[in-house]
């Protein structure tokens, strides 16, 4: 299990935990990021937002948000 912000470009996995406050929980739920969601990291540059693909949608999360999402990486 890894934090979303630790995954490299092209990594795929399933969200297994989200440790955030209720405001952020509401925001990410509204864009489809929930426990059990399958994601693919499109880009994860060092000082820019993480760009990922989830449920036919591209989503950008800043590093602080991404580090609060735990992902089970698929090989």
Where does each model-flagged region fall?
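Short, Lys/Arg- and Gly-enriched loop/turn segments at beta-strand edges
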Residues: 5, 25, 46-53
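C-terminal structural segments of small proteins and small subunits
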Residues: 48-75
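A structural micro-motif recognizing beta-strand termini
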Residues: 18-21, 55
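A short glycine-leucine-enriched loop at secondary-structure breakpoints
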Residues: 31-32
């Amino acid at each position: 299990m890894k934090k979303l912000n630790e995954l490299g470009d092209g990594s795929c996995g399933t969200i297994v935990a989200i440790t955030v406050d209720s405001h952020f929980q509401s925001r990410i739920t509204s864009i489809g990021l929930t426990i059990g969601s399958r994601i693919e990291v499109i880009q994860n540059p060092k000082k820019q937002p993480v760009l990922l693909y989830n449920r036919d949608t591209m989503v950008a999360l800043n590093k602080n948000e991404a580090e609060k999402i735990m992902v089970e990486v698929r090989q």
